[in-house]
Every structure is written in C-alpha cells, then in structure tokens.
Amino acid sequence: MPSALTASEIREAFLKFFEERGHRRVASSSLVPANDPTLMFTNAGMVQFKDVFTGRETRDYRRATTSQKCVRAGGKHNDLDNVGFTARHHTFFEMLGNFSFGDYFKADAIAYGWEFVTRTLGLSTDRLAVTVFNGEGGTPWDEEAYELWKKQGVPAERLYKLGLKDNFWAMGDTGPCGPCSEIHYHQGDDIPCVEEAEGKKCQGVACDCDRWLEIWNLVFMQFERKEKDGPLIPLPKPSIDTGAGLERIASVVQGKRSNYETDLFQNILATVSELCGKPYSQESGASQRVVADHSRAAAFLISDGVQPSNEGRGYVLRRIMRRAIRHGTQQLGLEDVFFFKVVDRVIELMGDAYPELRESRTFVLEVCRHEETSFRQTLSRGLKLIEEELSELQKAGGKQLSGDVVFLLHGTYGFPWDLTQIIARERGLDVDLVRFEERLKEEADKNKFAGSGDKATGEVYLKLAERLGTTEFLGYEGEGHEGEGSIRAIVKDGAEVTQATQGDTVELVLDRTPFYGESGGQMGDTGRIVGHGGKAVAKVTDAQRPVPGLVVHSVEVSEGTFKVGDMVQAGVDSERRKSIRANHSATHLLHKALKLVLGEHVKQAGSVVAPDYLRFDFAHFSPATSAQLEQVEDLVNGWIRDNAGAETRVMSLEDAKKSGAVAMFGEKYGETVRVVTVHPESTELCGGTHVRRSGDIGLFKIASESGVASGVRRIVALTGIGALQHVREQEHELRKVAELLKSNPKEVSKRVEATQKRVKELERKVEEVAVKAQTASSKDLLEQARDVNGMKVLATQVDAADDNVLRGMADQLRDRIRSGVVAIGGEKDGRAIILVAATKDVVAKGINAGALVREMAKEVGGKGGGKAEMAQAGGPDASKLPAALEKLYELVKGVGTA
C-alpha cells in the first residue's frame, strides 16, 4: 500500500524510476556550493548542474536524477522564525529531481511525472491538480504543456493557469528560463484557510493555505534572456529541471497533514521527547519540532564542512543550532547538554542514504557538544547583561532598547538578537532593530561573504569561457615546465583588447599552457611568455582560474608586442614549481598523518600551497600537543624516506570515491577526476602538481600550530631547503640565548627556570616596597575619611598604577579603618583602575563592594565586579576618575538610607 512507503523507500523508488528510464543516478552535491559565489547554501537540485544548463560544463550523460541535500536559511530564503510553528517550514530538506540537458523535453517530463505520482506512488488522480503558465508580460501561455497534461488524462477542470509569480522560472536576471508546471495534491477542504477566515474565497491551488499542497515543480527551460529585461530567445536545445520535496511527498503518501508526522521526523521527535520527558503532540510540540528540524540541518551542514562562527555560512549554522538549544533549555527544560544526542539520532537514521554523515560522526557530535557548552555559558552571561541594560532603561523611563546594545550582545557574546527582542517584549519594551541592522551592515561591509570562489568572477571571463572553452593544461606531462600555445585573448583593465605592447600590464589567455592556474589551494605559477622569436617578452607574475577551466596569465610586457593569434612559448619558473610540488605532496601526507594521530574526524578546512611554505587548516577542537606534532612529523618524514613512487590515475568520480580516495571540502569535481597517490598511505582527489617520488620532498618540519576559528586548527609547515633553514635559524637563536645565559644549549631550560624564579622573587620584593611606600602616609589618608551614616568612607586617588599595589593598599587601609569602606583609584596608560574594599561588619549591613564598583565604573566608561568585601573595576576614561571616586560617598549614603 502507498501509505506503507517510508521516506527512504520513496527516495529509492524515485531514483530507481528515473534510472530505469535512462537517467544517471548522481550523488547529492555538498550543501556548500562549489565555485559559486552567488549562493550561501545549495538550495535546489539544479545547483550542481548550473554550469551544465548554461553550457559551460559538459558531462558524459544527458539525463540525471538526484536526491539533493538542501538548506534554506539566510538571505531571501530566511524562514527560520517559522520553523517548528508550521507544518511545512524546514531549514534542511531533500529535493528529489530529474534533469534533461538538451535531451527530452515537455512530453517526456510530463509523462514521467504523471506516471510516477499516479502509478509508482499510487496517488489518486481525483486528488491531483496541475498548473501551467497563463502567459504574461508578452510571453505566450504554455498551451503545449496544457495539451500534454490533458493527454495524460488530467481533466480541464483540474488544469489551472497561473502567472509569472507561480509558473515561470528563471535562473537569474539573465540566462536560461522558462514556464513551469506544478503538481498539487488536495489534502481536504477541512484545512483552515486564511482567505476564508477573512471572509474571502479560498484561491485553491493559488492559495497559501494547505488545502492544495504543491508536491512537484517541473521547469521547462526553453528560453534564454541575454540581458536584464531583454527579449526571450528560444533555446536550440531546451532542458528539463524538476524538483519534488521528499518531506511533502512523504506526508501525502503516508496520509499526514504535517511533514513532522512522517517517519522522517517521528523517530527524531521520539528522541527529543525521551530526553525532555514530555510526550510529543502536534498541538504543543513546537519546541520539539524546532529541535528535530534544526538537528537535521546541523548534522548535514557540519558534515559538509561548515563550522559555527560569527560570519557567513558559519553564522547561519550557529543561529540554527542556538535556536534549537534555546528551545531545549528554556522551553523543554533540558538542563544537561542534549543537542548532540539528537544529532546522533539523525546520523543513525540518515547515514545509509548519506554516508558522509557516518564518516564524520565523531567530529559532528564534538562540534555540537562544544557549541552547546559554549552557548549555555553565553546564555547565562547574556541574560545577566540584558537584565542590567533593561533595568537601567526602565529606571530612566526609556521604552526602546538601543540597537547598539543588541549588536554588542550579538557580536561580543553571540547572543541571538531575536532572543533579546523576546526578553525586551516581556518587559514591555521595544528594540531598535533598525540601528541593529545598520550595525550589522557596517560589519558585513567590512567582511562581505565571498562565497567559495577564490577571486571575483568578472563578466569578461564568463564570456571568454563561453567562447573559448577550457584551457589545455600541459603541466602534467614530463616536467611540464614549457609548452607552445596560441594567444586566444588579451584583457586589459577588465576589457578585451587586440594587442599589448612594452610597458603594458595585461592578462593573456592561451589555448594551451604549462602554467598552473591557482586552485585547490595551490598558488599559480610564474615565469615567462616569449613570442616572435624572442622579440616579444612578458613576465608572468601570476596565473589564475577566474572561471573553472579557464587559465588567465597576469603578465608585464617587457619587450615587443603581443597580438591575439600569436604563437608563443610559455615557460614556468621550474625551481618555484619544484618547491610547490614538494609542498603540495607534503600537504597530502600531512593530512593523512593528522588523521592517524588525531583521529579520522580530521577534515581539511582550507589550504595554501606556496613555494616557500604550506598552510593546512583542519577540523579539530583542541590544540595538538607537542608530542602529537612530533608524531605527525615522524610519520611524514618516514614516508618521505620511503621514497615511494607517486602515482596519478584518471578515473570516474564514482570509481575514485569507491577506491577510498579522499575528496577535498569545497572543491567541485567533474565526472572524470585525477587521483593522486603520493605514498601508499595517502590517496586523494587532486588536480594539482606533485612530486614523482615522496623522497623528492626532502624534509618536513612543522613551523607552527594554532587555532583560527572554533573547531579549526592551522598548521604551517616547511619542506626541503626551507625546512632545513628553519631548523638552522632555531639553532642559531638557541645558541644566542645560551650565550646570554652563560650556559650551553642543553642547559638553557634549567637556566631559564632559575632566572624566572629569581625575577619573581625580585618582583615580589619590589611590590612589597611599593606598598609600604604608598601606605606610609596612610595615617594622613585615614584623616580624609568621611562619616556616612555612621560608617567611615574613604575614596582617594594615588600615584600607583599597578593592580597588585592598589589591592595591597586597599587591604591595608581597610584593616586600619576597622569599620567602613575604602576605594583606591589609580591611572595606567590613560585607563582608570578602581579597587573597593569593605569590612565584614558593613557588609553585614548591606554594603557590597562589587555593586559599588560597578556603579563607579560607569563614570569612567567601564565595567567591574567582584565579591562583597573586595571588588575591582577599570575604564578607558581616567579623566573621570575623581568623579567616580566621589560617587562612592553618594552610593554608600543610598545604601544606608534604603
């Protein structure tokens, strides 16, 4: 029975259906779009085929079917606040799709779609309706699709014509576009409709209510728009792009009114219910739905290499995770760290369909555990700070919390702005979101989301790629340092020109080149291009790939003239290339060694392969110990000494993955890939240049290991001569230190320890002398004490600028005053320092040094705190220190009269 089909069975049935009809089953691409700076996340099945549809990429198949991982959260698809409170909104979902690249068109697409929903899924034709484009804006209505649907047996009364908004699709302002048809399923007229609630008529398939549920969209790419608002030009080979949300289809097949009632979510919701001890219900389970939905998004995003952070994709992930954690802690009462347990259930349930979840399980769970632990601390600090700010605002009679405060909470403490808004509203206060968004924009302008491309893709390069195709790379064969090619294009200041003469700085595009264009972290080559028998010479300063497959040479013409069509000799700086090869191969070995030493969860998070160093970013939470780094070095150097022959094989992407080759995060691979084995221990997909034998690397030395973001570590390392020079420099420094300490290198550490101990002893003695000198006149200071409400209060500024000296003075004056409060102020580098100390008897009467110093700190523009008997504060405005100290008397008086 159709109702018995699970979501997994529906997914497999869809893919198998189209496989049997000549479609290639293609694996889901990453949620991080490769080489597409326009998208934050993959949000549709066609994303991985965008270049195929535009003709920039060709594949060895013309029909494809996929189950694509998608995330819609952030940008124009930001429905995050609705997730959990509606039946359909999700952050993560699966898009089933079938695609034709200039092969079949409307007739087959419509026939396939109708056959699958009515025969394979067994949906009743009486509950199905279809929409077609009605014609608008000068574009004719889709009569062809209308007639084809009728041919399938769809009656005219269930064929609806809708406009551009609903039934016309475009990739952007320019590019492929065309009408579309949507298949809708009737769930029942008893479902509430907003239109009817307002006294209007339900709009049926065009209504936003759920009576008619869209389950499949078939896009007919039959036009192309060359320029914005330009005419639609018929494509010579129209294509098909369809998308069906698995969650929606599962709800229909399983007879559920909500996606959350399907088996995709019920098992996850059961885990949430078990953790919080509250039974799930559709009516009261909003917070449980939030946790269930967000756990799916977190699992898939982290497994695809996204890390929680305060910018770009990482910030969207952080917001998703923290929203789930907040609902778990505040609404569901989950006191212990819980989110990673829900995510683990997601991995268990979906790991068969998406093996990458299981492969990265350890790391995914650690990221979730770490983020929740951190956020729980943030939540506590943030709640305390916002409480202070709101109390101050209400005391002053204010009605709106400043957007600057919201930004401070958001940026400094990672506190969600929407939570700040909720808390403010509970107090009857508004939030200045306009100012908050201004601050966000200012921050975004400083660090704009750059996408996954290394350089901005200029229109000129897109046009060149369309016209010229890919550049043939000669660098893999032989030494790969030299080659002959023809100049296909010359670009100057972003525009094509026909020639370049002496003194010009331009970019050359050749049909064939030995120059490696920067990609995959490997820097571009440098060298020379010579033409006209040596009469024209250009220095190549860089080689880039602004568009996949197109190599652009940045050159400075030093002699003669180069023209489009000239044959030239291109020569790479061979020594520089040799160093890059060594560093690139060493990067592969380093990656493998890190996995062996730190764990299989280690994933590359970025790299730079330069001639003089290599930099490798990887997913790992804690700093690697010295012993671990030594172990990594030993492994890599051992593999280098093995002098194993490096091997490069060309195979299909599918075969490469089956062979166990490691794919790099963020890289886009074609159907045919290069698989590089530097040593039997290391096999990776890679298009870069490498050594012939592992021994060619020479020597490997780690120069540094550090953290660059939460859960991301960075290693900088050197190879060959560079590594040797690094070791020698360290030796020279060690000898210098030994000479200064009048020791030998082996005894340096002992001598340094002894010296440090001596320095600390001297510092202690100096501090004692300073305190004695400052307190020698304490008798005079005590005479300045005032009587406030029967207790002695002293606030004074001294010349001491050391925290410890001020603390010592405060201690001594408190002892001498016997009963009362003392405040000592000092200045250091223009900043104010304030120490407040209170005797035990006045603390018992309600005096609190921490509360006093917090109020005093506001005068100097700072903050402070501490215990009831001793507290400290600091602030940037030392000029207001006298006013801050004077405020103590007023504050104590207020306590005494309270």
Swiss-Prot record:
Q: Which UniProt keywords apply?
A: Aminoacyl-tRNA synthetase, ATP-binding, Cytoplasm, Ligase, Metal-binding, Nucleotide-binding, Protein biosynthesis, RNA-binding, tRNA-binding, Zinc
Biological role stated in the UniProt entry: Catalyzes the attachment of alanine to tRNA(Ala) in a two-step reaction: alanine is first activated by ATP to form Ala-AMP and then transferred to the acceptor end of tRNA(Ala). Also edits incorrectly charged Ser-tRNA(Ala) and Gly-tRNA(Ala) via its editing domain.
Q: Name one GO biological process term.
A: alanyl-tRNA aminoacylation
- Give the family per the record: Belongs to the class-II aminoacyl-tRNA synthetase family.
Subcellular location(s) per record: Cytoplasm
What the entry lists under PROSITE patterns is as follows: AA_TRNA_LIGASE_II_ALA
**Protein name as it appears in the record:** Alanine--tRNA ligase
Q: Which GO terms describe its cellular component?
A: cytosol
Q: To which species is this protein native?
A: Myxococcus xanthus (strain DK1622)
Record-linked SUPFAM superfamilies: Class II aaRS and biotin synthetases (SSF55681), Putative anticodon-binding domain of alanyl-tRNA synthetase (AlaRS) (SSF101353), ThrRS/AlaRS common domain (SSF55186), Translation proteins (SSF50447)
Any idea which positions bind Zn(2+)?
584, 588, 686, 690
